[in-house]
Structures are given as C-alpha cells and as structure tokens.
Amino acid sequence: MSRLKAINGIMLRPIIWKRPSSNDAILQFIRQNQEISQSSVFQGTLYEHTVMRELSGKLSMNQLQKIGGSHDRGVDIRGQWPLDFVFGQVTKVVPLDAVPKRCKIHGTTLKPLRCKIEENDGKLDPLKALVQCKAFSGSKVSPREFRELVGTFASIVPDSQRNRSVILMCSPNLLTKEGLSLINTVKVPLIYLRIEMLQRIGDNYDVDNSGRLLNYYENDYAAALLQGCGIKEWLKLSLYRR
C-alpha cells in the first residue's frame, strides 16, 4: 500500500513519475486525489506535474524530480537539461549563428556554453535545472518573489557552478514590467516560463489541449550563457515533436 504524504495537513497520494512527457502521471495523480481536488494543495501539485510534463516534452529536460516540501528551500522540481542534445538536433535542420568566445554581462565575463559544446566534439555535461512553480491564476509574480528566487539560487549553487545551473520560474501569467526589469539585472541564469494551468471540462481535466508552455524568456545573463545553443529555434520549429 502506498504511503500518503501530508502537505499543510492535507493528504496527497504520491505517484511514481516514470514518463514526464506523457499524461499518464498527471491522470494518475488526479484519479488518486479526487477527494481533495478542490484544495489549493491539489491545484499546486497538479500544476507541478503539468510543468514537469512541459519541461520534459518541450525542453527535453530529464531526471525530473518533484521535491517540494518544508525543506525544499523554494525549489519544487530538480532535473537535468542536456543542451548538447538540443544543439545537435537543431543544427541538423538549421544553421546557427556563430557566438563570441567570451562575452561580458553586468560586469561579469563568461564563456557561452555553445563554445564548450563545440570544443568538446558536440558534448556537454547536462545543466542542473532548479524549478519553482507559482500556480496562481489571478496574480502575477512579484519582484519580491523573483528576489527570493535569486536568493534560493545563491543558497544552493556555489559561485563556481553558476554557469552549470539554471533556475526557472513557472507561472500561468505574463511577466510584469517590474519583474522583467528586475530579472534582467541579476547575475544568475534565470528563465521564466509561462505555462498554463490545466483547464476543466465538466468533471474532468483537458490534459491534451491545456497546460501548455506558452512563453519562454531568458534573462540577460541566461541569454548570454545560452546564446547559439538553438533553444529558441528548437521551440519555434517544434523540433521536440520529432
């Protein structure tokens, strides 16, 4: 018998996430937790599962683990991002512009990861991905929450590994002007993903046509680090469908 997990006093039935790119895990979670389906805990956890599906299916992230809890330090999901795979697939279809060997962003000099991929015969160790989910449909992410996210990154990732990790904020809402201005000043690779919440159809959820990745935005630091890796081409051309 599976053990129940309590969050804020509400019991959630855990699931084993085997194939994040499919809807199986989402449907299993919904089915096993019908009795609390009106709670905010259920909605938040459902959104995390939806985000995992999109990270795997649209951005080719893998080894995704949902870790949210009292000791998560603000991180809901961890995983790995094999950018060399994305780069390799994109360059089979379209040419990518050359990138500089070094670039300077906000007073920090860095080497674009594209250069490392080319220097290592198309190989690169996967980036560590730290993901925070904000499953609220009525309010946009505030600058304070972005500052807290940057603090989370700094507390988990040592300076020596800053360019080997990315932190992602996922929300159903568009960025505010204040939030956009703030994230473009920070010296960490931060990506904002606008991912829909699943929509209800009667008593069921439309897992096939909702919960989609709508917007992908890199802050200035991430844009410098990830330039030329083909991520935007990968998304624009829907190469993840192959």
Curated annotation (Swiss-Prot):
Subcellular location, principal: mitochondrion
Classification via InterPro entries: RRG7 (IPR018828)
Pfam family, one: RRG7
Keyword Mitochondrion included in the entry's annotation: yes
Keywords carried by this UniProt record: Mitochondrion
Protein name: Required for respiratory growth protein 7, mitochondrial
Taxonomic superkingdom: Eukaryota
A cellular-component GO term for this protein: mitochondrion
Keyword Ribosomal protein on entry: no
The family this protein is said to belong to: Belongs to the RRG7 family.
Compartment annotation: Mitochondrion
Lineage start: Eukaryota, Fungi, Dikarya, Ascomycota, Saccharomycotina
